[in-house]
């Protein structure tokens, strides 16, 4: 166990005490958000990512150790376990390395080599290794059933040697390192007709050293191969590898040459290639999943536009645009269908203008949220025209990815059983502006569309990572227990789908929950669930101000004592001044609290009911419309980062297609990844670098024209 902890400590840069604390709390049923927020003094203020890394690595090392024990036991049963082999297995850091060491002892299916051994050809194999002048003559002595001639017997003997040589652990390890450092992964066009949009054109004749392969290229090659467009291969320094293997023999003859050739080309290299491709894919998937997770986190943290009446606008050409007005709380007020763009007639378009203007006036619409899908550019122009008469109203282009998934879901049907799918989408688009987090948690995060090659990675690992991000953000922000949907509540630490639905049902039957203590009355919500969830649930209606903060009920008594010592009766300016000036270290000791816990309590008391998303960028509000034909190279624009990928970032500048900032145009300094400079949701100033009107593509730069010279 100590060695495992030492490995975790070494890899993650955490102390043995931190590891033990995290794993002990987890074993007791504590959730990651709870540990990160309410056990800082025990963990040394580890955040959610660090805590999850400890838990994940512990699980991975446990699986590795279990496999080592199983392998050692099987080799021991054969009586072939040496001290050197045991040590090599015990120090192996990868499962693949353990399997390589186990390979010579692994129970094999019936191979050519095993058949040859059973036929008694092993002595002939040994003769090949000696300087025998006439092997063919000697081989005649080994003719038997299945090996009717001396030539066939020699072939069987070669098979025995090929298997033995190809399982040489040292040679396989040397070959693996050689391929990793010097071999190239290649791709050739296999069937260009399957690549109608020429997405894979740059890979029709491609090669790159294995050790420098970028993750997005690995995933692109995998996809191209899967679609039948590309043929993937390797370029090796084969002669050098053959020379490695030849050093195992003291004599040279045609049979040994054959043994070396077959071992390398038929056995070892194909196995190493499979391993390398698996490792490249795993590394690429890990990077893609991390990137998607980072993008999702930033999207969920976009500042909400609270307290605004919003009109959701789901654009379409032929079937008409679906509109939905929601009040400041997100409650649907009305829905309507209009025909604002061609092929609608001129009369229909004029009627649509009047209908939109009437809705704005009747319901006091403050912002129009336009989905960025089909017909969004034309719809933006239409809305901008109408807003000339409403200078106080703005519009925003909203990323509608996943809105159609939500609108067709069981959750949406329960919420709006009498509405069409399209009208539900319009409501979702409007609500995304008011509270992105509350609305986006209703959608499978894989459908939100802020990733790269997300359909080409392990869906299980992707789901686990994205769910972790959603859980983390929801608990960091906190949830209003009286307004949250079951979908949002289910991400609160300690709560599951059943308990979340029970909370909503309890609200409907008993009215608003007025204190955290009352939450205990919800069916199926036991003591452990309450402990984990309570601090993340907010109750603005409570008479106890602490119920609308991140202060955990377990610390209410300490806070009362704090108020008593500081003579605080209300959280006015005088009280805030007292809280800011107190000595945390001394007061923490007096209250029997950890200093980190007291710091968090004070932060909550200084800003009760705070939403830390308010410190992030809000969406860009627009009143006019921009067309790609209006752009000129060198033009300065404001935009919002919509997606970050390995090679750059896509930015909404108010036209139909997002513009691309290539990584080379992000900084005057060298950067390894775009995420070092921008994040999803960032407001950025960009300059137009290149315009392709025909393909509707715009290249942007974060560097002013004079900075790129």
Outline where the language-model segments fall.
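Short beta-alpha connecting loops at secondary-structure transitions
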Residues: 19, 338-343, 367, 408-421, ...
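A glycine-rich phosphate-binding loop feature that marks nucleotide/adenosyl-phosphate handling sites
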Residues: 177-184, 313-317, 373-378, 398-405, ...
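Accessory alpha-helical DNA-binding modules that contact the DNA backbone or grooves
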Residues: 31, 43, 47-148, 476-615, ...
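Duplex nucleic acid-engaging cores and interfaces of nucleic-acid transaction enzymes
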Residues: 50-53, 60, 64-312, 316-418, ...
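Low-complexity, acidic/Ser/Thr- and charged residue-rich accessory regions of DNA metabolism proteins
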Residues: 138-150, 206, 228, 245-264, ...
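Long, charge-rich intrinsically disordered scaffolds of nucleic-acid metabolism proteins
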Residues: 97, 396, 402, 407-477, ...
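Long, charged amphipathic helices and adjacent flexible linkers at domain junctions
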Residues: 276-293, 447-478, 586-633
């Amino acid at each position: 166990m100590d060695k495992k902890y030492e490995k975790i400590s070494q890899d993650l840069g955490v102390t043995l005490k931190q590891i033990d604390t995290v794993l002990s709390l987890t074993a007791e049923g504590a959730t990651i958000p709870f540990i990160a927020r309410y056990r800082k003094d025990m963990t040394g203020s580890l955040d959610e990512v660090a805590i999850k890394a400890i838990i994940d690595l512990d699980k991975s090392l446990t699986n590795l150790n279990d496999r080592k024990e199983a392998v050692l036991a099987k080799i021991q049963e054969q009586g072939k376990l040496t001290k050197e082999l045991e040590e090599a297995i015990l120090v192996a850091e990868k499962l693949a390395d353990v399997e390589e060491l186990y390979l010579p002892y692994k129970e094999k299916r019936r191979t050519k080599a095993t058949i040859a051994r059973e036929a008694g050809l092993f002595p002939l194999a040994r003769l090949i290794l000696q300087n025998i002048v006439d092997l063919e003559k000697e081989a005649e002595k080994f003719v038997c059933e299945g090996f009717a001639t001396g030539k066939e017997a020699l072939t069987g003997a070669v098979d025995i040697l090929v298997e033995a040589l190809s399982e040489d652990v040292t040679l396989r390890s040397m070959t693996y390192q050689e391929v990793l450092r010097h071999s190239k992964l290649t791709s050739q066009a296999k069937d260009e007709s399957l690549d109608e949009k020429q997405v894979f054109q740059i890979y029709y004749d491609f090669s790159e050293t294995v050790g420098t392969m970028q993750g997005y290229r690995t995933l692109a090659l995998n996809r191209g191969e899967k679609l039948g467009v590309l043929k993937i291969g390797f370029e090796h320094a084969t002669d050098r590898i053959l020379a490695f293997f030849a050093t195992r023999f003291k004599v040279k003859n045609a049979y040994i040459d054959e043994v070396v050739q077959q071992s390398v080309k038929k056995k070892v290299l194909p196995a190493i290639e499979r391993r390398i491709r698996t490792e490249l894919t795993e590394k690429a998937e890990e990077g893609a999943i991390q990137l998607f997770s980072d993008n999702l986190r930033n999207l969920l943290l976009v500042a909400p536009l609270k307290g605004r009446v919003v009109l959701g606008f789901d654009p379409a050409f032929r079937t008409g645009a679906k509109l939905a007005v929601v009040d400041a709380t997100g409650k649907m007020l009305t829905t309507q269908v209009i025909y604002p763009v061609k092929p609608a007639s001129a009369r229909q378009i004029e009627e649509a203008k009047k209908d939109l203007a009437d809705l704005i006036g009747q319901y006091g619409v403050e912002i129009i949220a336009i989905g960025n899908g089909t017909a969004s550019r034309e719809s933006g122009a239409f809305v901008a025209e109408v807003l000339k008469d409403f200078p106080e109203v703005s519009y925003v282009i909203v990323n509608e990815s996943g809105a159609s998934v939500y609108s067709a879901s069981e959750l949406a049907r329960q919420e709006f059983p009498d509405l069409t799918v399209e009208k539900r989408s319009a409501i979702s688009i409007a609500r995304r502006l008011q509270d992105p987090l509350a609305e986006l948690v209703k959608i499978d995060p894989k459908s939100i569309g802020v990733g790269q090659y997300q359909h080409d990675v392990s869906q299980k690992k992707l789901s686990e990572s994205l769910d972790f991000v959603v859980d983390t953000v929801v608990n960091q922000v906190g949830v209003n227990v009286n307004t949250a949907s079951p979908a949002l509540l289910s991400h609160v630490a300690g709560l599951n789908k059943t308990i979340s639905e029970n909370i909503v049902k309890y609200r409907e039957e008993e009215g608003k929950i007025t204190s955290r203590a009352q939450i205990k009355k919800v069916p199926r919500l036991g003591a452990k669930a309450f402990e984990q969830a309570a601090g993340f649930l907010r109750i603005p209606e409570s008479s106890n101000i602490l119920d609308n903060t991140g202060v955990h009920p377990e610390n209410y008594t300490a806070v009362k004592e704090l108020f008593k010592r500081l003579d605080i009766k209300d959280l006015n300016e005088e009280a805030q001044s007292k809280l800011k000036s107190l000595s945390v270290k001394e007061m923490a000791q007096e209250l029997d609290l950890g200093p980190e816990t007291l710091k968090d309590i004070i932060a909550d008391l200084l800003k009760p009911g705070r939403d830390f998303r308010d410190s992030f960028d809000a969406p860009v509000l627009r009143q006019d419309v921009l067309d790609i034909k209006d752009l000129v190279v060198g033009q300065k624009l404001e935009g919002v980062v919509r997606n970050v990928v390995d090679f750059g970032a896509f930015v909404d500048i108010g036209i139909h297609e997002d513009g691309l900032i290539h990584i080379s145009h992000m900084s005057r300094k060298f950067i390894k990844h775009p995420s070092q400079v921008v994040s999803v949701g960032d407001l950025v100033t960009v300059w137009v670098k290149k315009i392709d009107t025909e393909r509707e593509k715009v290249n942007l730069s974060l560097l002013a024209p004079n900075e790129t010279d």
